[in-house]
Amino acid sequence: MARYDAPSRRSGGQKQNTFFGGAAILAAGAMVVKLIGMFYKIPLNNIIGAQGNADFNNAYNIYAVLLTISTAGLPVAVSKLVSEANAQGRRNQVRRTFQLALGMFLILGTLSFLVMYFKADALAGLMNDTKAAPGIRALAPAVVCVGCLAALRGYSQGHLNMTPTSVSQIIEALCKLFIGLSLAYALIKMGQPPEMAAAGAITGVTVGTVVALVYMVISFFLARLREPGRSRDVPDASGDIIRDILRIAIPITLSSSMVGIVTVIDSSLVQGQVQKALLENPACWELYQSFVDFAPLESAISAWKELLTEGTAATMAVLSAQAEAAQAALAAGTALTAPQEGALALHTTLESISRTLYGNYSSALTIYNLPTALMTAITISVIPTVSGALARRDRRGASRVAASALRITALLAFPMGVGLFVLGTPIVQLLFPKMESSLAGPLLSTLGLATVFVCLMLVCNSILQAYGFVNLPILVMVLGGGLKIFTNYNVVAMPQMGIYGAPAGNILCFGLCLLLDLLLISRVVPRRPRYLPVFLKPFTASAIMGAAAWAVYGLGSKLLSSAPEGGGPAVLSTTGNAICVLGAIGVAMAVYLVLVAALRAISRDDLALMPKGDKLARLLRL
């Protein structure tokens, strides 16, 4: 198994196991970025609707992989090499490392830009959403900026200056928030279709990377002015430096980007299987009858089948081939044949329905991804604190930190997952009034179960990496991602499941990853944490909390529901739903906090990982 040496840390009189210095700055910046992202995605979904949401996410998923690469392995590699050279007083080595890294990122970024801009239609086709092409093109320039940002952030972090990285990330997120939402809103008001509004929202991302890059360049030159004069050290050969960068970056990048890669594959697969089921198995139409008008699809299928040659099966493979031929003919400026016209019309209709369905699923994913924001501070702190304990040969201390990280994660993940499971539909009605809550609500409830697994998995990955086993999380994610793809390929195509089966892949994927991570930790980590005490109390408190939330919402909805003027069953208004949801969450939080304190589910060691943890421990009398 691949290992790296845990870096040593000087205590300097500071207490271990706390958020301090650079880790605290990075954690705070990451948390702010996640919060800004929440305030961005929720109104965006309501502005561009389900189809625009699908187009946005299909384009953004491609960018997310590149974003993960830029904020994971590459900056870490540059910062490590720069930090080592800087500690040795080798300023020429620092400059050579940065120059080579910047050159590498510019080359890769330019190649990615060319592919995304000129092959946007092909990439959108691979995602089974041709309307995502404008968004992919709008996002293409950001790839070049992302590469430059990676080099500059790594250089800054290598000098132990984390502030520029955090500030640039916040600038990027704020531009995305204000410019992206403004453009999307303006385009919708101008009568532009959802895919163009989605492209406008994505333009905010691109502008954000440009502004963040300008800030990082200014910070870089200001830092250079404060550096001492010339250095006489001889830098290493360029080839050796490049090999060092790749040696460090590749394992971390693969581990961090695996989730994004699986997401891209899975998004394409889910939409493709939805379209296939709609065409080949009309029995699945019953799943969506309440919010999808199938008359245009039925008409398009009938017209297309009449144009098929005798003996040709009416399958998705045949339709896709004919639609591709039609699009190629249009690109070449040639006239379409009648079968090509029929195939293109049917393919467009199928794609429109799948965009609506996937857009609702994406809105559920938006909420499902929010709990991971709270994991950022924990995952960032685990690696340096565990590594520092190991460098001091304090295995008992490292084990305590790992156990505390798992316990804090469980204390956060279990109630959030249970809350989403119990209140999935009401939360969708509150946050996304334009979405179909009868679709997105059950999807969110099912995804709530996966929330627990993914949060715990992220912290387990950090623990394994802190102990030096950087390749194990990659192997685990490959297995989990393969299971997710296999599951969704088969489940989504079932007429009785359809897109409602998509969350099953998340549950099985991250459930398997968590199980394997816990088994690996028990095998390769000395003094492994005891899992039953870590998970039992948070689970018990969360289960009782979930029952309380369910009861409060149910009682409130009965009291606040009223019959419509024309008669009929009682209906809960939007305001009434908001009151019930917020009331249920408030009661649930109070119940959970009381149970956590009563069960002694958190210890002083756990609180020591948090800012002001000592004061909180004294308040709870721990």
What kind of region is each of these model predictions?
Residues 121-139, 341, 350, 355, ...:
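Interfacial segments at transmembrane-helix termini and the short loops linking adjacent helices
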Residues 2-4, 17-76, 106, 113, ...:
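Signature of the first transmembrane helix
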Residues 2-5, 553-622:
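Membrane-proximal transmembrane or re-entrant/amphipathic helices at the cytosolic face
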Residues 33, 41, 75-76, 138-158, ...:
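Short runs within selected transmembrane alpha-helices of multi-pass transporters and secretion channels
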Residues 72-87, 364, 375-392:
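Helix-loop junctions and terminal segments of transmembrane helices
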Residues 1-36, 92, 96, 233-252, ...:
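N-terminal membrane topogenesis motif
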Residues 45-65, 194-203, 240-248, 271-368, ...:
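Interfacial/gating helices of multi-pass transporter permease domains
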Residues 2-15, 194-202, 217-256, 283-290, ...:
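Interhelical loop/hinge segments that connect adjacent transmembrane helices in multipass membrane
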